[in-house]
Amino acid sequence: MVVTRARTRRLSLLETDSRPSTPQLDTVAELGTASPRATRRTRLNSSTLDVRTPTRTRRASLARGETPEPTTPSSVKRTARTPAKNTRSVRQQLTLTEEPEENEVKQEKPSPSPSPVPKEGKGKAQRKPSVSPSPGRTLTPNQQSDEKRVTRSMSQTPPMPTRSSSNTPRDLNDSPKVEQKAKPNIKTTPKVAVRLEKLSMDKFSGKKMEKAKPLIVPDELKDNGVVEEQNKSITEAHSQAPETHESAQPDKDAGKQSFLKSFTTLSKIQGSSKALHPDESADTITKITPTSTSKKIEENMDDVFETLRVESPKVERKIETLQKVHTVGTPEIKEKDEPVGVDNEIKTKTETPQKIEPPIIESKVETQQLIDHPQIEKKRDTPQNVSTVDLMDTSPEKDESMEDQEFLDAEDSIVQLEPQTDEPVEKPKELEFVDLDDDEPVFPSEAPKYVEDSKEVHPDDSMDDDKQNKIDVTEVIHLPSIRARAVRSPAVEQKKSVDFNNDTDDLEVEKKRFPKTPGREKVPVCRILTPKPETPLKLALQKGRNSSTPILKDQERGLSNSTEELHPAPPQIDAIKPFDELESKNAKDEMVEQSPMSKQKAENKILARLESFEEDVEDHGNEEENEEEHEEDKSISEFVDLEAEDAGKDYMSGDSMDSSLRREMEENEIPIDGESVGSKDTEESTPEESDGDDSFIVSDNEDEEDLGQLCYSSGEDEIEDAEESEQAERSSVKRRRIIIASPSDEEHDGKVQSNDDSSENKTEKPKNQSNCSSNASKLSEAAQLLNVSEEKSSISETELERSRQVALNELNKSERFNKTETQLDISVMEVDSSDHDEEEKTEKVGAKNNRSLYEIVDSDDGEEQDQDQSDADKPAESENHSEIKKSTSFMDQMSGAKGNKSVYEIMDSYETEDPKEAGKNEESDKDKPAENGKSDKDKQAETEMSDEDKPSEIKSPSTIKKSIISTADEEALLAELASSDLSHLEKMFNPLQKSRRQSLHVPSPELAAKNPKLRRRSERVEVGNDFCPSQSFVDMVAEKKRQKNKRKRLSKSLSGAPEDLEEMEIKHERKRLKSSHGASTDSMEEDNENETMTVAEEHHSDGEVSNGEVPIEEKPTTSSEKPSASELPEEEETVAVEELLMEKPKTCDSPRSEERPTEIVTSKPKGMAPVKVEKTAEYYLAYCHNLLEAANEAKLKEKKEHLASGAKQKKPKRIAAQAPSKLLGTIGSESETNTAKSSKQPPALKKDVKRLQAARQAVSHAVNLLAPPKATEAEPRTLSRKLSPQPPVVDKKSAKQKKGKKKQKPQEASPLKSSDEENHGHRIRTNAGYVTVVDEPPTKVPKIELIKTSSGMVRVEPCTPKQKYFRELPPTPKMHGFREEPGPSGMSRKRAKHAAPKVEHNSAKQAALRFKEQIFARRS
């Protein structure tokens, strides 16, 4: 049967039936045994309707041994109302538990009709087919005066007199109990009438329904013709049934007629109570079928009884018993049952019990239910369910004995009729033998089991017993009940129940077992929170750390170590036991304990050997803890003594880790200065793969030296050190990076000046080597170019220094704009590398290749990936070719001699924001031949410098060297970070965002490289001041933008409107031209245009978005600081910077900075002595402004980090917008005029606000195009992870900052005042007063880190685990044998962040479970 349909039928039939079954109370009242209102059923739900909820009265009566007559309807109801999962078992319970009581009550009067219906009732499977029997039940109330019983407090439908004739409703397949009652009343005389007593729904109905299901369907199939005949007979007997049932209770035929009449009434009532009964059709069918069955039974009682013997072996004994009793009533009921699927049994009973009267059956049901219920608990008193043939054979005997005990026979016959299963009826021996007389009061549900006893019991006696409600048990026949009936639950089972001996009964041999509804039965599940003694959590965390530390060899070691550690993870970290142990514990705690403990001990011994003695002690502690946990698993609240024993005096923070992990961490330990991607380490690993060294880690030795030099570039000393390190590196391995090229240059340079230059280059180059940064390569190569120019063009040292200064200035300019776009830096590097290439061609081809490789790295980093790849490929061939190709790609200038020019042009083409400088370079390059590339570049630089940088070029060589060294150190340090970051960032960005990766990839390395530049902001400011873009730069900007197909692609990919971006770039170029003139209004326009440009450039590249925004904004002074500040955050904050640009008007400042840097300060930073007083004043103002900006940018950087980490970005945007507006005003005024600063600041703020809004919109649009909704939050995280030299560290910092902020907010918001506004977030006003919401649990919980694992939430104890805590395992699931799922427990911990709420939630569950237990009379 489909549970839903069966339930609906039960609901419809059982409600009516339960009312018809209530009339049995009248019979019980006649018998005097029915407990008053014991049948009362609390109607919980339609689902519980089938399950006749044992009312406390019913339970009390059961405890008294009384079988409250309404119990049967209530049991039927319970089955109907039980939820779908429980319907099956509930149906079985219904049939046995309550109906036997009602059957007893009714068997006094209409026992013949109840017995057939109880048959169906017991076979709940029969309910499906016998939708018609439900009307039969409806008739029974009319038959019997039990209409009084109809009043049920629990009945969903109003109490119905038909319920008193629960015999007829028993016909209903929906209510097996009622059907059982009705069947014995109609078909069987008291002997044959099988009392449908509600055994505990769990025990009886579950098994009985299982058994009855096979009987029901086959019986329907077999007895469709019989059902038709029975329908006829029922229709005939339907009119007769009421009379017989009412007038002739002793007469079984009269009982049958009364049952039919009551059944007809019930059918009518059921038709009226369709709302209560989901299946009217089922009710109607049931009504029609039982009526016709009763009539036909009356007509063909004997014939059908014989037929039933033959057809259904289970029914045979019942049929004979019914014949003895009065087969007229019972056979009709059985025929009614035939439509239900008990058709064979119905036929048998229809033939046999012609005498059956509902009263007799009821008396039998009650008396025998008391007596037989133990038998039903024994699982089958009536062999009907087991083997109908045997029952048929014994039925005549039973009928004789049941003549003595008519009521017993009626009940037994009913029971026999109902079990329509093929199981042998004679499993009662397996069942515990229960004397009906002895157990009768205590176990009314077993009455059907005693139906086999009805063989010995005489039908006359059963008739008398029906009247008297007392059963004389001549023989106690133990028929196998459907389910093992546990006598132990008398409250439910005391009601006599008809057990259907079905195949399921054979399957379920345990008769005494208290049957739980299969849905209800819950296998005790092993503890799901099974902490593994050695949790891999720490190992996984350490693996993450190792992955964050990018040293390959160390990582490989770490991986091998981690794999080794996975098996024996240090148990000290977590004393949590593995699932295997815990699950095995639930099965057998102690046994499982010992085996895993032994395993743990073995592992702990190994670990102790590998690790320190403290770890071994901790392992023993863990074992003890595991034992404690095993012992405590039984208890609800488990004390998890995860506390590792005190590590001891010698315990170090890393001792708990495996020796391999500790070793790995020590080897990979990051120096305080930070790990550097040193040329030495990279050379050791792979000299030629220096380009491929994408690890964030900086080289250990030389990078540290380089960092020292960069930070403390004092000049020649550091240069000498750098030379030594470079020579060693050069000698050790040739690298693609410039470092090797610079040593080659140094080797080639035999001159002291060339050595000095090469020493400067070395100072720059080791940095470049370690960082592979375009800036470092630019500086070192620029110095090398100067040296080569000295060698080739025989220029004086001063000229070389001037050329170096020019190159450095250009590099600085390119860096300024490279902040926005790394292409400038790349071009600078390439320019230097091209010069170096010429030098290297003259000097060394291998050095050229190394340089070219390094330049390739920078070009890959600085340039967009398309050209970077081509450059990387071509420079590998030769720097000149790669640079020439670059120049052809960008500048369309192909000449090996013009390699310097082409490099500068490449720089210009790469310089999106430095296009002024690039333009100058290109123009100067075009104007001057590139035969002496370096000398030409020096001249070009001088031409550029001649505008503003000549004084700096005129600087003394020592001053030039110092400036070059300082800038070179600064830029080399930045270049190291940038270079190391660039290749790694390329790899990082490429998988996630190809378009972005290109754009972000170019700027982000420089940003990473520029992060350390903050140390030398002053020098950077000077470098920025040295850069003076000329108006030709604006032309070059236009050319660059036009020639920047890659950036256009980036803009297309990022902003999605490349053409618009190109137009915006053109506008930006125009505005930059205007800004180059230096008009304040132009600068303001340029700010707007620069914002658009920054947006466009940001679209070009995410890294460029951040860089472009700030670098464009950067003035000569601002450019030095902002590039440093912006470069530091840019890697992490590429998106954050975009947002900040949207927020800030710095973009407005950047055009001004660009315009005025060219105008104001270009040579000053390198020209130690300012050439112009105005420039010096502006320089100082710009320097102060840079300091202010540095502070602002530091704050902004923090905010950007928060943004990158995913912190709320709106707030940082607001802050950024406010701060930048101030910066914009200050910057604009400073760039325009020192005095005009303050005056221009407010208008700049207004314009900046508008610009900020426009920029924000553009940037937000671009960001949205780049990444849908998560662009602000998710992108910064990914970008920070990708761009940051050590993204995990940044993420950790950002996450910590977020956590700190969250913690601080509750602390700040802690309500000190009662006002709702101040404390509104944490203070809630209620009628009782103000409720303060305290975030204490989150503050406490973070101490113990919760990690979600397959076992659930695992608490990670601190490195020195000393905390003991109670892990409250919810007692409810374990106590009730429910599976404890980690999900709910983990969720509760997450929600409440402490285990207490789990118990609270479980308390509700416990209450519900207890309620269900009470309702279903069994433990859930």
From Swiss-Prot:
<feature type="modified residue" description="Phosphoserine">
    <location>
        <position position="1032"/>
    </location>
</feature>
<dbReference type="GO" id="GO:0005730">
    <property type="term" value="C:nucleolus"/>
</dbReference>
<feature type="modified residue" description="Phosphoserine">
    <location>
        <position position="834"/>
    </location>
</feature>
<feature type="modified residue" description="Phosphoserine">
    <location>
        <position position="635"/>
    </location>
</feature>
<feature type="modified residue" description="Phosphoserine">
    <location>
        <position position="548"/>
    </location>
</feature>
<feature type="region of interest" description="Disordered">
    <location>
        <begin position="1364"/>
        <end position="1405"/>
    </location>
</feature>
<feature type="modified residue" description="Phosphoserine">
    <location>
        <position position="1153"/>
    </location>
</feature>
<feature type="modified residue" description="Phosphothreonine">
    <location>
        <position position="348"/>
    </location>
</feature>
<feature type="modified residue" description="Phosphothreonine">
    <location>
        <position position="307"/>
    </location>
</feature>
<feature type="modified residue" description="Phosphoserine">
    <location>
        <position position="759"/>
    </location>
</feature>
<feature type="compositionally biased region" description="Basic and acidic residues">
    <location>
        <begin position="913"/>
        <end position="953"/>
    </location>
</feature>
<feature type="modified residue" description="Phosphoserine">
    <location>
        <position position="312"/>
    </location>
</feature>
<feature type="region of interest" description="Disordered">
    <location>
        <begin position="993"/>
        <end position="1023"/>
    </location>
</feature>
<feature type="region of interest" description="Disordered">
    <location>
        <begin position="1038"/>
        <end position="1169"/>
    </location>
</feature>
<feature type="modified residue" description="Phosphoserine">
    <location>
        <position position="595"/>
    </location>
</feature>
<feature type="modified residue" description="Phosphotyrosine">
    <location>
        <position position="904"/>
    </location>
</feature>
<feature type="modified residue" description="Phosphoserine">
    <location>
        <position position="902"/>
    </location>
</feature>
<feature type="modified residue" description="Phosphothreonine">
    <location>
        <position position="33"/>
    </location>
</feature>
<feature type="compositionally biased region" description="Polar residues">
    <location>
        <begin position="129"/>
        <end position="144"/>
    </location>
</feature>
<feature type="modified residue" description="Phosphothreonine">
    <location>
        <position position="140"/>
    </location>
</feature>
<feature type="modified residue" description="Phosphoserine">
    <location>
        <position position="130"/>
    </location>
</feature>
<keyword id="KW-0217">Developmental protein</keyword>
<feature type="compositionally biased region" description="Low complexity">
    <location>
        <begin position="284"/>
        <end position="294"/>
    </location>
</feature>
<feature type="modified residue" description="Phosphoserine">
    <location>
        <position position="1314"/>
    </location>
</feature>
<feature type="compositionally biased region" description="Basic and acidic residues">
    <location>
        <begin position="171"/>
        <end position="182"/>
    </location>
</feature>
<feature type="modified residue" description="Phosphoserine">
    <location>
        <position position="12"/>
    </location>
</feature>
<feature type="compositionally biased region" description="Basic and acidic residues">
    <location>
        <begin position="332"/>
        <end position="354"/>
    </location>
</feature>
<feature type="modified residue" description="Phosphothreonine">
    <location>
        <position position="563"/>
    </location>
</feature>
<feature type="compositionally biased region" description="Basic residues">
    <location>
        <begin position="1295"/>
        <end position="1304"/>
    </location>
</feature>
<feature type="region of interest" description="Disordered">
    <location>
        <begin position="533"/>
        <end position="778"/>
    </location>
</feature>
<feature type="modified residue" description="Phosphoserine">
    <location>
        <position position="660"/>
    </location>
</feature>
<feature type="modified residue" description="Phosphoserine">
    <location>
        <position position="132"/>
    </location>
</feature>
<comment type="function">
    <text>Required for the correct organization of the nucleolus during development.</text>
</comment>
<feature type="modified residue" description="Phosphoserine">
    <location>
        <position position="653"/>
    </location>
</feature>
<feature type="modified residue" description="Phosphothreonine">
    <location>
        <position position="72"/>
    </location>
</feature>
<feature type="modified residue" description="Phosphoserine">
    <location>
        <position position="833"/>
    </location>
</feature>
<feature type="modified residue" description="Phosphothreonine">
    <location>
        <position position="55"/>
    </location>
</feature>
<feature type="modified residue" description="Phosphoserine">
    <location>
        <position position="155"/>
    </location>
</feature>
<feature type="modified residue" description="Phosphoserine">
    <location>
        <position position="18"/>
    </location>
</feature>
<feature type="modified residue" description="Phosphothreonine">
    <location>
        <position position="1158"/>
    </location>
</feature>
<feature type="modified residue" description="Phosphoserine">
    <location>
        <position position="1315"/>
    </location>
</feature>
<feature type="modified residue" description="Phosphoserine">
    <location>
        <position position="134"/>
    </location>
</feature>
